[in-house]
From Swiss-Prot:
Name of the protein described by the UniProt record: Glutamyl-tRNA(Gln) amidotransferase subunit A
Residues annotated as catalytic: 79, 154, 178
GO biological process, one term: translation
Subunit structure as annotated in this protein's UniProt entry: Heterotrimer of A, B and C subunits.
Provenance organism: Carboxydothermus hydrogenoformans (strain ATCC BAA-161 / DSM 6008 / Z-2901)
Signal peptide: none
């Protein structure tokens, strides 16, 4: 097996046992990036020099007999909406194209302390607004399984980098499905933790009540390993939960016999691709054979999650993105004759079409006369969506649904119809609205394209999701498949 396709656990074990060096793994990964990146375009910035320096530091620590950390020598990609001191952080937008932050996000600090090796910053839909990575200012990222298709979004670069062997694990952010949907399209594991479980300090805000950082990995074990590193209370994030966080790896080999899994009838609807439906049915059979018990549940307000999301998220975005005005940092139009013209021209030239669409929509929803009719009503329905989940969890331990209605779609297929694009996140949005954890797990193929299922858990019960996902993974072979590049 090529070094870049080893799991994070295998890499740390081999490096600590001195079977391989961190520098060897880093070189193999950067060589892989050089070889396949022209096809995939997962990265906005590749940090080869920094990565090799970090790898050398791991090897030096081991030589001195020091503990190199739980991610010793593991190549990690970081979505380009997380602050990295001294490394360009663009959000794939013209407005931040040359922005170099002076500080690290909390998750980035934690990765450094854990001995990770940074491969670079990955491409995304501009300001994380999109479902296909076609909204990037720079270029679209391609799906490693089919270069004519999207990798999903908004964390498409992170998902594609892990699937293509350009990183071993990666960080993404998930506001309405932006980790789980690209993980499904690229055939890897993607976990959105409970809101508040991972610090948002240093994550460029899109919708602050929905955003959450989480891991991409090729195995459930690697996702648990990365979650161990990034989860935890952070006083710099006022929404960070001050609770005891478990060792997520300790859940992996637990028995799932007798676990009750709910199947929400509102998620098994017309419009689901036949290949996705078959993969879900097969996954249910595997979990039943391991002793899990299934029952139908109802989440009646699910049907409102799309309109609720597209009122709340743009409303928060319109407020958060007001800071990009050309005054303090980022792009500025120097041709303007006065400050008002400078504001308007900077924003008109700096933001792409989808970002402008959402700023307009959010500003409208928050404006006088419409605030109560739209935004306030959406907040009330959000509460009803959350209460549906609370009721379901009195009967079952977790829920199983499709992650996406279809496998990855072709470039340009949905760009002219925003609502059709938004519908690709129809099964993931409610999880963000309710602040719950969700994981996308590879469940097979529809032709040559990966398909997945989603597990949704109670707040801060990532352990149960990881336990069930790992049990499924250990009894199937889907996670071992690799794209031919």
């Amino acid at each position: 097996m090529e070094l870049y396709y080893l799991s994070a656990k295998e890499i740390t074990e081999k490096i600590k046992a001195k079977e391989i060096s961190a520098v060897e793994v880093a070189k193999a990964t950067f060589d892989r990036i050089e070889a396949v990146e022209p096809k995939i375009q997962a990265y906005v910035t590749v940090t080869r020099e920094l990565g090799l320096k970090m790898a050398r530091e791991v090897d030096e620590k081991i030589a001195r007999g020091e503990d190199p950390g739980p991610l010793a020598g593991v190549p990690v990609a970081i979505k380009d909406n997380m602050s990295t001191a001294g490394i360009r952080t663009t959000c794939s937008s013209k407005i931040l194209e040359n922005y170099i932050p002076p500080y690290d996000a909390t998750v980035v600090e934690k990765l450094k302390e854990a001995g990770a090796v940074f491969t670079g910053k990955t491409n995304l839909d501009e300001f994380a607004m999109g479902s296909s990575t076609e909204n990037s200012r720079f270029f679209p990222t391609r799906n490693p399984w089919d270069l004519e298709r999207v990798p999903g979004g908004s964390s498409g670069g992170s998902a594609a980098s892990v699937a293509a062997g350009e990183a071993v694990v990666a960080l993404g952010s998930d506001t309405g499905g932006s980790i789980r949907q690209p993980a499904a399209f690229c055939g890897i594991v993607g976990l959105k933790p409970t809101y508040g479980a991972v610090s948002r300090y240093g994550l460029v805000a899109f919708a602050s009540s929905l955003d959450q950082i989480g891991p991409f990995a090729r195995t459930v074990e690697d996702a648990a390993l990365l979650l161990n590193v990034i989860a935890g209370h952070d006083p710099k994030d006022s929404t960070s939960a001050d609770i005891e966080y478990p060792d997520y790896l300790s859940f992996l080999n637990q028995d799932i016999k007798g676990l009750k899994i709910g199947l929400p009838k509102e998620y098994f609807i017309d419009g689901i691709d036949a290949g996705v439906k078959k993969a879900i049915d097969d996954a249910i059979k595997v979990l039943e054979s391991l002793g899990a018990v299934f029952e139908e549940v109802s989440l009646p307000h699910t049907k409102y999650s799309l309109p609720v999301y597209y009122l709340i998220a743009p409303a928060e975005a319109s407020s958060n993105l007001a800071r990009y005005d050309g005054v303090r940092y980022g792009y500025r139009d120097f041709e303007a004759e006065d400050v008002v013209e400078m504001f308007s021209r900077t924003r008109a030239e700096g933001f792409g079409a989808e970002v402008k669409r959402r700023i307009m929509l959010g500003t409208y929803a928050l404006s006088a006369g419409y605030y109560d009719a739209y935004y306030l009503k959406a907040l009330k329905v959000r509460t009803l969506i959350k209460e549906d989940f609370d009721r379901a969890f009195t009967k079952v331990d977790l829920l199983l649904t499709p992650t996406t209605p279809t496998p990855a779609f072709k470039f340009g297929e949905k760009t002219s119809d925003p609502v059709s694009m938004y519908l690709s996140d129809i099964f993931t949005m409610a999880v963000n609205l309710a602040g719950l954890p969700g994981i996308s797990v590879p469940a097979g193929f529809d032709g040559h394209l990966p398909v997945s299922f989603q597990l949704i858990g109670k707040p801060f019960d990532e352990g149960t999701l990881l336990k069930v996902a790992h049990a499924f993974e250990q009894n199937t072979e889907f996670h071992k498949a690799r794209p031919k590049l």
